[in-house]
Amino acid sequence: MMSARYPRTAAEWTTRIQGVSSERCDLEMLLKDEWRNRIAVRDDDPGVRATRQRDIVVDGREYTALKDALRAADGVSAGALALASLHSVMRAYGHGEQTVAAFVDATATAELKTAAVLPVIVDHIEHTRLTCAEAIRELDETLRRKDSYTRADEVLQRGLFDALLVLAEREVALSELPSAPLVMVVRDDAARGRLCWTMAYAGELFEDTTVAGVLEVVREVLGQYAGRPGDRVAEIELASREQRERLQRWNATDGDFPADQRLNDLVEAAVRRSPDREAVVFGTQRLTYREVDARANRFAHWLLGPGLGVRSQQLVGIFLDKSDLGVVATLGIWKAGAAYVPIDPAYPAERVRFAVGDTGLRGIVTNRHHAGRLREILGAEHADVTVVEIESVLDEQAAADTDGLLSVKPELALGVRDLAYLTYTSGTTGVPKGVPKYHDSVVNSITDLSERYDMRRPGTERVALFASYVFEPHLRQTLIALINGQTLVVVPEEVRLDPDRFPAYIEEHGVTYLNATGSVLQHFDLRRRTSLKRLLLVGEELTAAGLRQLRERFSGRIVNEYAFTEAAFVTAVKKFAPGVTERADRSIGRPVRNVKWYVLSQDLKRLPVGAIGELYIGGCGVAPGYLNRDDLTAERFLTNPYASEQDRARGTNARIYRTGDLARMLPSGEVEFMGRSDFQLKLNGVRVEPGEIEAQATEYAGVRKCVVIAREGAGGGSDRHLVGYYLTEPGAGVTEAELLSFLERRLIRIMVPARMVRLESIPVNVNGKVDWRALPEVDLARPDTGGGAVGSTTTGGVRGELREI
């Protein structure tokens, strides 16, 4: 738990505690909303005292079992049991690997101010490997090191401790307690056969309901330490029984969907309902549902023939820009029983060759415009790959279809659990990861979204096809139009890149439904686009400031979609009705039908409501893993420890996907996004989430967008400093000094960046998300003047940002 050489003086303890701060837990999520990010939950302010208290009492059979457990563990003390429980509870709420508490032994003195204090540091990586009995014994040995105790006035009120644990033999008044926001008082009242645990807290900082929830967890954890001595600490349940039941109810998302239908079946049903309705608009090209279906059927026949000879679930590449041809190619591949791999024609040659080799493609569908470059990219290495020019194939098939038989879909025995497509997501090592997606999971998602977005009335919606072909929003936009008898309006690339022409294009074509990232939409003024009814955001968090900025440009319904390529088509949605301009939290909503989610600890244990953990996704839509990447699959796709007996009987919900997002369950049953785990920072033991700083910065008048990252200082990896980059509204002269001064008034000191650098544009990657690696390096020393804006290293303005997407 600690090294063999224990500190013996207050100075040594201070040095030891400060040395573990980078991996330390942070209890800020227990604070009231208005205090979060403004103070740290530490004993560093003499003016912060416990003003309220709540108690739990362990008595009767529970107390008897507790005392029996202590005797069975070689007579360890109640203090050691309480300390073990406290550290586990702090870890549950603080999301850290090390916790620091002050053990105040008040059993041998009448005055708490003269009580001896022992700092206790627990390393949970080691601690969770022990059995409960071993962990208590180890802490009991720690408490017996009398030469390591120090005086209260030498270590308390110096910001060293996450919480104080007072072991007392009598009732202790609040006025007697040391100054600290959180103090636990434990009293073993053997004469009355009970153990009393009091949680004393600063009433202005903590909600009573929050404290009550913590005490539920204390009771649960205390009982497990006493009642399960042979179990490992990692196996302890960190949520109370009542909370676990509530979490299970919130995951009751099971529902019916057309599980006997493939995606092409859903489109074919729309064709039968409305054969002559306009299906796809691209430039001057307007295709009805009947025409789209006939072309797709002809293409499917060709794919099955000697031209390519596709087999069931064979992968076929699509190397096309957004167009009506892409829609026909996708449907034709599905009708032939195959699956597609989207490849962007704008990709570098190496990226294209990687996808071809990784998937073993034997054929790639392209057009006349891109065919020459594609053949050049494939070269001799992939000379056996057939390049299919789709216009030529469609022309030949139309000419050959004299009896109309080629316009009828091929009769094949196709499965609903067949592969639908394989798409690539970016890899942290720079190597893309292929993710296979199946018909049934996408059918579940797209039919759920159709109902949620009220898209079921044919002929009433016009959906913009805005996203690049290689990203899932492209397919989402295509399907939500075509399975519901709506019109898909393909946005030409030259229009999509123009912040002036695009809004006019929306109005000209009567677009009602637009789906894009917030980074893109912030460039478009949609105020006078009367046709637009729905704005759907995907790929980025919608912050409070982002919502307000969108409301300046759009007054209709806004939906924030939460999605992962590796999991369901869309995992969750959060709706904002027309007129809603504010949001009080960072909720991403609730899971869609047949999707489950779990906020789990480092040991995959369910966490209490309000505690931060990592978000895992289960249920319908979780991919089986990454193509040809067994190492990453084992790391990110895990056996679901919370699959029910019903799940196992049906063969569902067997795996969970580790998202890498930090989150917490809200009392409403919604999940609040807390940032990426790989962007989480610990500075001097305080958890710093850049999104919180970014949100505060955009509250300042004139600041349009902000991103915050950590930069290494001269001292290397341990010497890290926050740097913010911000954009201003046109004409706003927001200086660095002004913005830093504003943040200093709104945030605790450690969360205020060393620098705030104004940029002309913030670089984005091909996904439309901020490209962190492309942000310019800066001198960490603050300049004396506000200075001008720094140019982005990769994009020179609005067009540059949009082109990347």
UniProtKB/Swiss-Prot annotation:
InterPro entries: AA_adenyl_dom (IPR010071), AMP-bd_C_sf (IPR045851), AMP-binding_CS (IPR020845), AMP-dep_synth/lig_dom (IPR000873), ANL_N_sf (IPR042099). PROSITE patterns: AMP_BINDING. Pathway: Antibiotic biosynthesis; penicillin G biosynthesis; penicillin G from L-alpha-aminoadipate and L-cysteine and L-valine: step 1/3. Its EC number is 6.3.2.26. It is an enzyme of class 6 (ligase). It catalyses: L-2-aminoadipate + L-valine + L-cysteine + 3 ATP + H2O = N-[(5S)-5-amino-5-carboxypentanoyl]-L-cysteinyl-D-valine + 3 AMP + 3 diphosphate + 3 H(+). Keywords: Antibiotic biosynthesis, ATP-binding, Ligase, Multifunctional enzyme, Nucleotide-binding, Phosphopantetheine, Repeat. Binds 3 phosphopantetheines covalently. Residues 783-805 are annotated as: Disordered. One of its GO terms (biological process) is secondary metabolite biosynthetic process. The keyword Lyase does not apply. It comes from the Bacteria. GO terms for molecular function: ATP binding; N-(5-amino-5-carboxypentanoyl)-L-cysteinyl-D-valine synthase activity; phosphopantetheine binding. Pfam families: AMP-binding. Its cofactor is pantetheine 4'-phosphate. One of its GO terms (cellular component) is cytoplasm. Belongs to the ATP-dependent AMP-binding enzyme family. Each of the constituent amino acids of ACV are activated as aminoacyl-adenylates with peptide bonds formed through the participation of amino acid thioester intermediates. This is N-(5-amino-5-carboxypentanoyl)-L-cysteinyl-D-valine synthase. It comes from Streptomyces clavuligerus.
